[in-house]
Amino acid sequence: MTTIRVKENEPYEVALRRFKRTIEKLGLLTDLRAREFYEKPTSERKRKKAAAVKRHYKRVRSMQLPKKLY
């Protein structure tokens, strides 16, 4: 359970922003969304492999020299 201490004279918007930031750092929302529906192990492996391939091609594309502009 994530808790934050609200300081004296601290606006609630700032406290809410700090709370959202801590939740985002811990990755609780992404974990919650992933567990919202059951995913078969085969489809999970397929999704992770596709993400790895996408990351690989993105890394390769960023390492290529830019095209000549003339």
From Swiss-Prot:
It comes from the Bacteria. One of its GO terms (cellular component) is ribosome. One of its GO terms (biological process) is translation. One of its GO terms (molecular function) is structural constituent of ribosome. The keyword Transferase does not apply. InterPro entries: Ribosomal_bS21 (IPR001911), Ribosomal_bS21_CS (IPR018278), Ribosomal_bS21_sf (IPR038380). Disulfide bonds: none annotated. Pfam families: Ribosomal_S21. Belongs to the bacterial ribosomal protein bS21 family. This is Small ribosomal subunit protein bS21. The lineage of its organism: Bacteria, Pseudomonadati, Pseudomonadota, Betaproteobacteria, Burkholderiales. The gene is rpsU.
